[in-house]
Amino acid sequence: LTGLFLAMHYTPDVESAFASVAHICRDVNFGWLIRNLHANGASFFFICIYFHIGRGLYYGSYLYKETWNIGVVLLLLVMMTAFVGYVLPWGQMSFWGATVITNLLSAVPYVGTTLVEWIWGGFSVDNATLTRFFAFHFLFPFVILAMTILHLLFLHETGSNNPIGLNSNADKISFHPYFSYKDLLGFAILLVALASLAH
């Protein structure tokens, strides 16, 4: 939601991208807060993802191949989204990042130069690059949402982890109030931590 509000005021242009972000922070009502929540929220999202992966490794969830592989694709998609989003406020990439990626691509025999021009939209990082990065950063979350639904769909094919294979119905407790309050508490703690970073 914060991204949608930011997109209303952002300009994907190398000359005015940084100025538009400064305008969001200074002139838009609570623009500084929206930008803060967007950036720090993304960082918290990654922390949650790493916890999720760690739990999956601990409980051997990689044995559910389809669910795990979709999760890996999800992680790559989220990382790609974060990468193209990181470029947007500055209106240019760090020269180091641009050089490394450009050199990697241009090293491909025969088609290297064409690859660089195809990805950047020119010989280097320029206006075309910024415009397509903005478009990708806006579109990828919808792809991520679709993949998340697939991730859950495959998880519900097998159910979550039950290595012994015994009937565990007797041990089950209702989702509400136990798990709903547990999730609500975690969400509240995360929200307080996020809000405290927004000063």
UniProtKB/Swiss-Prot annotation:
SUPFAM superfamilies documented for this protein: Transmembrane di-heme cytochromes
Keywords recorded for this protein, A-Z: Electron transport, Heme, Iron, Membrane, Metal-binding, Mitochondrion, Mitochondrion inner membrane, Respiratory chain, Transmembrane, Transmembrane helix, Transport, Ubiquinone
Transmembrane stretches, start-end: 1-8, 32-53, 68-88, 133-153, 181-199
Any GO MF annotation of the entry: metal ion binding
Keyword Transferase belongs to the record: no
Gene3D superfamilies in alphabetical order: Cytochrome Bc1 Complex, Chain C
Binding site for a ubiquinone: 156
A Pfam family: Cytochrome_B
Cofactor dependency: heme b
Residue positions binding heme b b566: 52, 151
InterPro entries xrefs: Cyt_b/b6_C, Cyt_b/b6_N, Cytb/b6-like_sf, Cytochrome_b_N_euk/bac, Di-haem_cyt_TM
More info: Heme 1 (or BL or b562) is low-potential and absorbs at about 562 nm, and heme 2 (or BH or b566) is high-potential and absorbs at about 566 nm.
Family statement: Belongs to the cytochrome b family.
Subunit structure: The cytochrome bc1 complex contains 3 respiratory subunits (MT-CYB, CYC1 and UQCRFS1), 2 core proteins (UQCRC1 and UQCRC2) and probably 6 low-molecular weight proteins.
Function summary: Component of the ubiquinol-cytochrome c reductase complex (complex III or cytochrome b-c1 complex) that is part of the mitochondrial respiratory chain. The b-c1 complex mediates electron transfer from ubiquinol to cytochrome c. Contributes to the generation of a proton gradient across the mitochondrial membrane that is then used for ATP synthesis.
Protein name (record): Cytochrome b
Species of provenance: Sarda chiliensis
Gene symbol of the encoding locus: mt-cyb
